[in-house]
């Protein structure tokens, strides 16, 4: 099984149509990876599905970087 970090990066790459090597922990979804608001909503939905969790809208708005996504998923795993 892949680590949470690897799984998050794979989802980000797939959802945003970028190469996995571009998905570094410090990358901003919008500024560095070219995501728009719809992309970020779809990304959150993909993370919810992959990690079987629900991310409230107010929390989703704070997830703006790859590291923020990793941190959120790590802290909310059952």
UniProtKB/Swiss-Prot annotation:
Explain the purpose of this protein.
Carrier of the growing fatty acid chain in fatty acid biosynthesis.
MF-aspect GO terms: acyl binding; acyl carrier activity; phosphopantetheine binding
Q: Which Gene3D superfamilies match?
A: ACP-like
Q: Which family does it belong to?
A: Belongs to the acyl carrier protein (ACP) family.
**Positions of post-translational O-(pantetheine 4'-phosphoryl)serine modification:** 37
Question: What's this protein's name?
Answer: Acyl carrier protein
Lineage runs: Bacteria, Pseudomonadati, Pseudomonadota, Gammaproteobacteria, Pseudomonadales
Q: Where in the cell is it found?
A: Cytoplasm
Q: Which residues form the Carrier domain?
A: 2-77
Q: Which biological process terms from the Gene Ontology are attached to this UniProt entry?
A: lipid A biosynthetic process
Instruction: Answer whether the UniProt record assigns the keyword Lipid metabolism to this protein.
Output: yes
Mainly resides where? Answer: cytoplasm
Listed under GO cellular component are:
cytosol; membrane
PANTHER family recorded: ACYL CARRIER PROTEIN, CARRIER DOMAIN-CONTAINING PROTEIN
Q: Which UniProt keywords apply?
A: Cytoplasm, Fatty acid biosynthesis, Fatty acid metabolism, Lipid biosynthesis, Lipid metabolism, Phosphopantetheine, Phosphoprotein
What post-translational modification does the entry describe?
A: 4'-phosphopantetheine is transferred from CoA to a specific serine of apo-ACP by AcpS. This modification is essential for activity because fatty acids are bound in thioester linkage to the sulfhydryl of the prosthetic group.
Q: In which pathway does it act?
A: Lipid metabolism; fatty acid biosynthesis
